[in-house]
Swiss-Prot record:
Annotated protein name in UniProt: Protein krueppel
A GO biological-process term: segmentation
GO molecular function: DNA binding; DNA-binding transcription factor activity, RNA polymerase II-specific; zinc ion binding
Organism: Musca domestica
Cytoplasm in keyword set: no
Cellular component, GO annotation: nucleus
PANTHER family: MYONEURIN, ZINC FINGER PROTEIN
Length: 74
């Protein structure tokens, strides 16, 4: 497993950053190309990674999943 060997065979041709997985390189390349394939259905925002879209959607749903340990506020 590459995780423990430190092997990073996938290199970005633009900035030479290296990755352990080809799909990590593919996602990284979007930073250079400007591709943002994930679109918010509520507004005009677009995102490189689906996780960022999911986090953004909380703006529209009002979901606040994290609680403050000091005041119990969200």
């Amino acid at each position: 497993e590459r995780t423990h060997t430190g092997e990073k065979p996938f290199e970005c041709p633009e900035c030479h950053k290296r990755f352990t997985r080809d799909h990590h390189l593919k996602t990284h390349m979007r930073l250079h190309t400007g591709e943002k394939p994930y679109h918010c259905s509520h507004c005009d925002r677009q995102f490189v990674q689906v996780a960022n879209l999911r986090r953004h959607l909380r703006v529209h749903t009002g979901e606040k999943p994290y609680t403050c340990e000091i005041c119990d506020g969200k």
